[in-house]
Amino acid sequence: MSPTLALTEDLIRRRSVTPEDKGCQDVLIERLSAAGFQCETVVSGPDHFRVTNLWAVKRGRAGTDGKLLVFAGHTDVVPTGPVEQWRSDPFEPTHRDGKLYGRGAADMKTSIAGFVVAAEEFVAVHPDHAGSIGFLITSDEEGPAHDGTIKVCDLLRTRGERLDYCVVGEPTSVSTLGDMVKNGRRGSLSGKLTVNGVQGHIAYPHLAKNPIHLAVPALTALAAEQWDDGNAYFPPTTWQMSNIHGGTGATNVIPGHVIIDFNFRFSTASTPEGLKSRVHAILDAHGLDYTLAWTLGGEPFLTERGELSEALSSAIGAECGVATELSTTGGTSDGRFIAKLCPQVIEFGPPNASIHKIDEHVDVAFIEPLKNVYRRVLETLIA
């Protein structure tokens, strides 16, 4: 069994559902310390939601003046869902038909194992490497992400730490390893809209004011709005409703208010402030009595073609035999926090078709090439 596969299986066995780490980072600390890394644990969050973070760094011969390449990842996984629907124990790595099954196999314990082994191999061959290698690992990426990567980034910022390159191990591939990497992500802006009316008997609408009826024209206008045209890197911004709550449960009562949850996934062609302003203008134009609470999940980020994307594309071509596609599709990731500290952030990992699903898995044949891609990037940028 290869060291990468063995480490992947060890991590999968640990039931690290957010925010639990279940010793995953202890395993990484043992491995990285043996390879010469200085490891620091950063614990954050309230008593009922303690998050474990790891910052590990091995300085090159140029010290802090040299380039620093960081791998970012998360040891936490999403819940399994109905265990009885899995063909095998989700926390017992199982091999079937050339695939490794287990929660976190694709998202993202294989990536973590791959980069750790790549770093071990790299420093063994290049003990006097010029640049530095870092690891930023959290147990709160799949959850609210308030006490994970963002806290470590804040800490590094206060120390004046400069990050030059960051590879995030998210599962970005689609059909085969390396066919897609993410060089950016859209921003996420959510709103909770409450439209007020007057509750009353449904048989006497003239004595009430139905907030659902009042809200519908405004919601229709919001759904039809063209927020922007996107750009060369991002598709147009989207606005989607996710929940509508109204009524008392009775069929003969006009509700006093209705609550609508919605979300923007927005490109660099728009700003949170601009989107908020336009939403309020549409609601005001319809004369609604409303309140609106906003939550900014993250701003968009983009890494244009440069040293990191070229190194990664070249490594993928050499190891996987495919021409990779740079993409900004999909949801948010911790890259949004790191991008404020690091000018070049690229996400790359195994295919994502099974992530968060029953019987999550990774092709065993992709595990060593993934590690080799990571090692080639280290060779190119910091040897």
Curated annotation (Swiss-Prot):
The scientific name of the source species is Ralstonia nicotianae (strain ATCC BAA-1114 / GMI1000) (Ralstonia solanacearum)
Query: What is this enzyme's class at the first EC digit?
Result: hydrolase
Family matches, as InterPro entries: Bact_exopeptidase_dim_dom (IPR036264), DapE_proteobac (IPR005941), Peptidase_M20 (IPR002933), Peptidase_M20_dimer (IPR011650), Peptidase_M20A (IPR050072)
Q: What protein is this chain from?
A: Succinyl-diaminopimelate desuccinylase
| Active-site residue list | D76, E141 (proton acceptor)
* Cofactor binding, note field: Binds 2 Zn(2+) or Co(2+) ions per subunit.
One GO BP annotation is:
L-arginine biosynthetic process
- In this chain, Zn(2+) 2 is annotated as bound at D107, E142, H356
Question: Which family would the database say this protein is a member of?
Answer: Belongs to the peptidase M20A family. DapE subfamily.
Q: Does the keyword Chloroplast apply?
A: no
Role description: Catalyzes the hydrolysis of N-succinyl-L,L-diaminopimelic acid (SDAP), forming succinate and LL-2,6-diaminopimelate (DAP), an intermediate involved in the bacterial biosynthesis of lysine and meso-diaminopimelic acid, an essential component of bacterial cell walls.
GO MF terms here are: acetylornithine deacetylase activity; cobalt ion binding; succinyl-diaminopimelate desuccinylase activity; zinc ion binding
**According to its UniProt record, which cofactors does this protein need?**
Zn(2+); Co(2+)
Keywords attached to this Swiss-Prot or TrEMBL record, sorted alphabetically, are: Amino-acid biosynthesis, Cobalt, Diaminopimelate biosynthesis, Hydrolase, Lysine biosynthesis, Metal-binding, Zinc
Report quaternary structure and partners.
Answer: Homodimer.
Q: In which pathway does it act?
A: Amino-acid biosynthesis; L-lysine biosynthesis via DAP pathway; LL-2,6-diaminopimelate from (S)-tetrahydrodipicolinate (succinylase route): step 3/3
Question: What EC number is given for this enzyme?
Answer: 3.5.1.18
> What does the entry list as the binding residues for Zn(2+) 1?
H74, D107, E170
- Extract the CDD domains matched here: M20_DapE_proteobac
Instruction: Report which reactions are catalysed by this protein.
Output: N-succinyl-(2S,6S)-2,6-diaminopimelate + H2O = (2S,6S)-2,6-diaminopimelate + succinate
